[in-house]
């Protein structure tokens, strides 16, 4: 294939698509560049589906190479290893909008690999990778209902900004990524600084309008490439099987889906399914058990969806806007710094907040360099929470994604480092799950942070909305169950305060989600959120005035930046001895800020006292109480402050004539001395005889402190 190149303007950036040069054995390959950020995306699809497979095996791998930023990886092996959290999140960002566009019944394995090969620090590669995945699928010939476009939307000074740069984004009140086709939005992922529903909806619409430039360019690019579509046809519907399953199961399934308790309902449905499979096979319908099971699932979907659209009660008897029963408790773990147990129906999260010092911050190694994250939120979804057994180990993609969503929901209300100098880690342990565990994590996180005494700006709650859309109409559902999520058309999660939205995530399985539907969903979500916040406020209305007795207290003092070296000492000897002897953690910034962290208040006071002594300036004419540390023929050296010695000349020991210094002083003597002079070289002249003159003020007592070991 000859190289084919397509360039177009996308907001403030120039985007170039190129194929036909690299990876020519892949089904499709596209190099996408946006102002020097280059992502190489390949697609490989198997021509035949594996026998017996009943699911669509789509894999998306996004990977960053450090050479893209002119760096060599750290670590012993000096090469990239397992995917980072950021890479995992972007893999999900690519996967979510493309997955619904593969036709039902297409079960051939497809793998999308996006590799960042060059990075401009001002241009984030995630949007570039999403555009590349869309372009590669569009020219692959694989059955795909795209292309899609992708856009990042910021909100600055009351205006929407298309694809803000990495330097602009910190000043933006919004970081929203939206993806969709020419006619519909498919995916939204966002974090906001407590914005109104109207602003959030406007951002989605703005992003969808702007991404049309991408969709049009990819269509033109695909036409230039001219790949022939695969010769694939959807499997025919077995009408006889469909009718037989409906005949045998409709009535019983209808009753089963009135059972409110999840475990009992699942057990009942499982028994119905086993009987139906057996009866269908016995009736002579030519299909295997797997196909019968698929048709049984389709019938389940039709029953649940039809009931909702007709205005009948939902699976657990609720109406569309009703929230499940709520239960909130704080301070449930005696030794944790902050804890909360949040229960909504059959979804439950035990959320724990821990306070740490600056050294506990997570060091994140990114393409453009390292950064420290002072707020971490981790989400764990063990198999027991859904009554199952399973492998336990490192977090899976879903857990990483849900944790990040919950973090986005809470981040807007977190205090700055100046307001609260602690590093904070929140862990959400999902102990029960039947829908919307990520939003339970948002609610639990807000409660646990308040219980820990973190001065968050406001309480935050989250709610998951669903949608059932049929030809005869649509219904938006509040606080969806797991089954409603699985059988519905939309997963729409909103987190926020009483004032506005802090996070919005939307995944849509069908085309045709209109602005009207999103508007209704946001309005309904606001009502649900306010209801949940009211219940949460009954448990705890404001952050606790004091942090836990088991949390470290952080005390902050300022010293002269030139004195930092004195506190650290040679090879770190002084600060190491300080931390070991006082039992504190001590951190220093280049501007002279010193943070002392200790659970024991007296230990912190002792560390502060000793640091102040180390960094104190010697004052002329002041009287100090010091210790004799060395004798010489011409006088004695007295330590008056940690690391600071002065000379008492032989003539300044007493009014009488002194022949031998040792006759008057010995090493270890504690004496009063007056500072006569500090010369330009920092040498200190002291006097014992003037310090003992009757008109002088009381002596400043010597301060015991860590001294840097003398050089041998």
UniProtKB/Swiss-Prot annotation:
InterPro entries: ExoRNase_PH_dom1, ExoRNase_PH_dom2, ExoRNase_PH_dom2_sf, KH_dom, KH_dom_type_1, KH_dom_type_1_sf, NA-bd_OB-fold, PNPase. It catalyses: RNA(n+1) + phosphate = RNA(n) + a ribonucleoside 5'-diphosphate. Its cofactor is Mg(2+). Mg(2+) binds at residues 485, 491. It comes from the Bacteria. Residues 621-689 form the S1 motif domain. It is found in: Cytoplasm. GO terms for biological process: mRNA catabolic process; RNA processing. One of its GO terms (molecular function) is 3'-5'-RNA exonuclease activity. Residues 552-615 form the KH domain. One of its GO terms (cellular component) is cytosol. Its EC number is 2.7.7.8. Keywords: Cytoplasm, Magnesium, Metal-binding, Nucleotidyltransferase, RNA-binding, Transferase. Its main location: cytoplasm. Belongs to the polyribonucleotide nucleotidyltransferase family. Component of the RNA degradosome, which is a multiprotein complex involved in RNA processing and mRNA degradation. Involved in mRNA degradation. Catalyzes the phosphorolysis of single-stranded polyribonucleotides processively in the 3'- to 5'-direction. NCBIfam families: polynuc_phos, PRK11824.1. This is Polyribonucleotide nucleotidyltransferase.
